[in-house]
Amino acid sequence: MPLAMELDFVQPRQSFTSALSRGSRNFFGRSKRWSRWEFWPPYLFYPPVVAYIAYLGIRFRSWTLFTAANPAIPAGGFVGESKHQILDHLKDAAPWLPFSGLLECGVPTHRLAEAKEFMRRQGLQFPVVLKPDAGQRGAGVAIVRSLEQLNEYLMNSSFPVILQEYVPGEEYGVFYYRHPGDARGRVFSVTEKRMPVLLCDGRRTLEELIHADDRAVCMSDFYLRKNLDRSQQVPAPGERVQLVEIGTHCRGAIFLDGVDTITSALEEVIDRIAQSFDGFFFGRFDIRVPSRQDFMAGRNMKIVELNGVTSEATHIYDPKLSLFDAYRVLFEQWRIAFEIGDFNRARGTRPTSVTDLLKATREYRRLAQGYPE
């Protein structure tokens, strides 16, 4: 096998899929995707989780009690919340934040001028990150490397956009919670995010290499769309080709269980940052950092995003973990969300109504239809 997904390099060999036609390889990839639960579509994976949430709703006498877990975030961060407003709540943790600015809807040329002025004022150079202010699962996130790409993104976006400093390095997801009244919170989960990298043999095209890999073939449709302009190129032998840039599982990143990176130093820093956000108790920090050593020491970190109640402990997508492991973690996660919501309800926080939650979901889906891939 000529490739490696930043996990383990192996010697090149001829794969079964290399002998297949392009159509057959695509069919093989889609079929293999169904055999690995981490790639299942939401409608197949989430029914047991939804059933457990319904059970918790009966037990705690509120279907939407989880929305009270984070009183400072609309609907607790269930859907459609402003990422920019959340980062604003973390201003007391400014050393841990990259420069970010919000480009409201408006005339594209005016937005471009605003973006250029923001970059000038903050001393930012390309690349920068653009993403919808309300977004989930990496939808609409782009790394732009030129003024032309920036202009193209803004010309095709009719929604509020966050322009953020690009932070190089490694990426981690840190799931945190704190029961109201407790002096300290807890790091519940850490996910190491790896970008898929192919080790090329100098003989096959990028498309053939993607189809030859046991894991990459499961997401071949997505990888080929993201690399359409070079899919028929033959990279040099030994060349490493990174397939995606965004650290989201459904967009091709590899997620690994990072439990061994949790240290007292890391927990102390995360807890201090979380408690600077009054009314936040439950969610996941997405963090960029120069190295694993820096991360474990809780230093040189930048929080690129903070997600609320619909965050997942994404280490469950580690290929080593079973479907049973994933459900066990998610059930515990949702139980904690309901427990925190119950405590906050007793202190006067009102859960979002089912009607308002459905309305927010419909509005987000309408907005997200216009997001670039």
Q: What annotation goes with each model-predicted range?
A:
Residues 3-12, 290-373:
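C-terminal active-site "lid" helix and adjoining low-complexity regulatory extension at the edge
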Residues 6, 16-30, 122, 152-161, ...:
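A short, terminal or domain-edge coil/loop segment
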Residues 15-126, 136:
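Conserved N-proximal alpha/beta basic substrate-recognition cap immediately N-terminal to
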Residues 72, 82-225, 263-267:
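Active-site nucleotide/adenylate-binding loops and adjacent lid/helix of ATP-dependent enzymes
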Residues 100, 174, 287, 306-308:
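A structural signal for short, well-ordered beta-strand segments
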Residues 138-140, 256-257, 315:
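A generic structural signal for short coil/turn motifs at secondary-structure boundaries
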Residues 169-171, 180-186, 279-282, 295-301, ...:
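Coil-to-beta-strand transition motifs
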Residues 210-297, 343-372:
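A long amphipathic alpha-helix within ATP-dependent nucleotide-binding catalytic cores
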